C-alpha cells in the first residue's frame, strides 16, 4: 500500500522501485517479487527460500514439516519460482553456517528461477558466513548491487 500511495502522490516512480533484504528480509524479498507487482527488481542476500530445508520450525512456526507440509510449502518462495519473473539478484556467503540459510538455499532458488525462464544472478562470496566481513567481498557485493539496480531499475 505504501508504494502505491507514494506513487499516486508523485513522490516515487513505482516502475523504478526495488526491494532488498538480508536473511529473513531476503526471504521476504523473494516472496514480494513472486506475489506482487510493486517492484522492478529485487536483491536478496543470504536468505532461506525453501522452508522444507528447515523442517523443524522457523520464525513462530513450531510444527515440523511433517506436521504441516502445506505451511512450509506455502511460505517458501522456492514453491513459486515459476512466478518469479522480475529480476532477482541472489548474493550469499559460500561458507554460510547459519542452519536455516546454508548456501544451498540460494543455489537452488537460482536454478529454479532460471529453469522457469526468470531473470536471476547468483553471486557467491568466498569464505563468507551469514554476515559478510572481508573488505573485498563487501566492495564486490556493493558493486554487484549497484550494477543490478543500474540495469533493472535506473534504466527503466
Model-assigned labels for residue ranges:
Residues 1-156:
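Active-site-proximal cap/loop segments of hydrolase catalytic domains
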